Structures are given as structure tokens and as C-alpha cells.
A protein has these predicted regions:
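Periplasmic-binding protein-like
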Residues: 141-149, 217-259
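Acidic, polar ligand-binding/catalytic clefts
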Residues: 95-160
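Bilobed "Venus flytrap"/periplasmic-binding protein-like clamshell domains
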Residues: 64, 75-91, 143-198, 208, ...
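Extracytoplasmic small-molecule ligand-binding "clamshell" domains
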Residues: 42-122
């Protein structure tokens, strides 16, 4: 950080010479009252960050439209979650760094407790079970679950999966809903992420995918051979996740900046960009 210093100009040439001599000898001048605040008093000073000056965020990638690999982005990633986090980071005077992480290790809190990142931004639903291990930000997105099938599969609802194979992502609320609601003779298969789920249905390894509606919608838009046949209102809200009891100041700072993004319209602009 550069600190501007003001040197008084003396009335005589001799005094000017003395002033120049003092500067050249390295004697520090007192900072002026208009100098910027030091790092110790900056908004990010007490956030206990993994790396100073950086907001380190763990996310399970890909999970479009929330987390997307993007070589054109400074962080290497884009998507709704990532861009919201970038907005938060900028408001805190920080640089965003994104680490690709397994979702199950995020929702269990394992990666967060290990202090590998400051928080998780990964389309994570706030649940009472997860609250036992992690702290959440204020909700930032309302979501539905959905069922994606191949257009010519003949499957029109969850009941139509009797005797068939249903793909879900491990550790998700989609898996929980499938376990409770799918036909008893449906085979439910876990996958690490959407990066494996989507190729699996394309290859005919599974008959359907049950997961968050925005993600399945991305697939039906990308390939007209697939469609969402049902959505399920499970009253889910997403939150950003923090190590339990360890990042309270950061949690508050993120909540404050989310409110600021709503107030200045930047959140709404991102929402419109990704969800219309």
C-alpha cells in the first residue's frame, strides 16, 4: 500500500535544502491525516483467511449454472455461485481463489474444518443435519428438485422408474428425496458429481437423473433429446458454508455483502444472467 506524505515547504531555500537532505537520508515523514487506513483496520483484517488478501472458496465443479470451468475468468471458474462470491470478495477488497472439491467433503464439513478454504460455495442446501457440522450464510437461492429423462424413454414421472436405474449425486438432498420417494424396486446409483451423472445418462448407464432443477435445466437446453418431466418443491434454500464456529466474522461479512449486493442491484443482475 502506498502512503502519500506531505512535506511542508519552508520559506527559505536553505530550509528546502534541509528538507531534501532529510528525505534522501531515509528519515520517514509522519503520514498525513488523509492517509488510507492500514491493513489492520481494513474490512478483511479480522476474517482469519486461509491466505491474506484472498477469499479462498471451495466448490464442486462442474455444476452448471452454479459452478462452471471457465478459462476466460480470472479465477478459472464462473457460474452463479462463483460470480456472487467474486462480488463479495471485491466488496471486501479481496481476490477470489476457487478450489475444486468433492461435494461430499464440503457438505460434511471435512474440507472446511481442515482449513483448506475459507468457505464453500457449491449450491448447498441448508439442512438441520448439515447445521450440526457447518455454519451457513443467509439463504441466497431457492431451489426445486427435478427428474431428467431421455425424451423417448417413456418415463413421465418418478413412479415410472420402477425396475429402472436412477442416478443421484452422493451426499445431496436430491439423493435424500430419491431414497424416500422413488419406487422400491428402482436402483439408485450414487455419482460423485454432475460431471459423472450427465455422461452416464447419455451413455445409457442410467435411465434418469434426480437433482436440482437449474442443473437439469442446463442439460435439457444443451441437448433436446433430454427433458425434465417432473419438479418437486422441497422447500430448499442454498447457503454458503463455513467451518462450524470457526469463521463467525467471515460469516457476518459475507452476509453483510450479500445484503449490499441485493441493495445495489448486482445480485439481481447475476440472477437474471443465469436464470432469466
Amino acid at each position: 500500500m502506498l502512503v502519500k506524505k506531505t512535506l511542508a515547504v519552508a520559506a527559505s531555500i536553505a530550509a528546502v535544502a534541509l528538507t531534501l537532505t532529510a528525505c534522501s537520508s531515509g528519515t520517514p515523514a509522519a503520514p498525513s491525516s488523509s492517509a488510507p487506513a492500514t491493513a489492520a483496520s481494513s474490512p478483511a483484517a479480522d476474517l482469519q483467511l486461509v491466505a491474506p488478501g484472498t477469499l479462498t472458496v471451495c466448490a464442486d465443479v462442474p455444476y452448471a449454472p452454479f459452478e462452471i470451468e471457465d478459462s476466460s475468468s480470472a479465477s478459472g471458474y464462473s457460474g452463479f455461485d462463483i460470480e456472487v462470491m467474486d462480488g463479495v470478495a471485491k466488496k471486501l477488497g479481496l481476490t477470489l481463489k476457487v478450489i475444486d472439491s468433492d461435494f461430499d467433503s464440503l457438505q460434511s464439513g471435512t474440507v472446511l474444518v481442515a482449513n483448506q478454504c475459507d468457505l464453500a460455495a457449491s449450491a448447498m442446501t441448508i439442512t438441520e443435519e448439515r447445521k450440526a457440522n457447518i455454519d451457513f450464510s443467509d439463504p441466497y437461492y431457492d431451489s426445486l428438485q427435478s427428474l431428467l429423462v431421455k425424451m423417448d424413454s417413456g418415463i413421465t414421472n418418478l413412479a415410472g422408474l420402477a425396475g429402472k436405474t436412477l442416478g443421484v449425486q452422493k451426499g445431496t438432498t436430491g439423493k435424500s428425496y430419491a431414497t424416500k420417494s422413488a419406487p422400491k424396486d428402482a436402483k439408485i446409483v450414487d455419482f460423485p458429481s454432475d460431471g459423472e451423472l450427465w455422461p452416464a445418462i447419455q451413455a445409457g448407464q442410467i435411465d434418469a437423473i434426480l437433482q436440482d432443477q437449474p442443473v437439469n435445466h442446463t442439460h435439457e437446453v444443451a441437448d433436446a433429446k433430454y427433458k425434465i418431466v417432473e419438479t418437486y418443491n422441497t422447500n430448499e434454500q442454498y447457503g454458503f458454508a463455513f467451518a462450524k464456529g470457526k469463521k463467525l466474522e467471515l460469516q457476518k461479512a459475507v452476509n453483510d455483502q450479500l445484503k449490499a449486493m441485493h441493495a445495489d442491484g448486482s445480485y439481481d443482475a447475476l440472477y437474471k444472467k443465469y436464470f432469466g
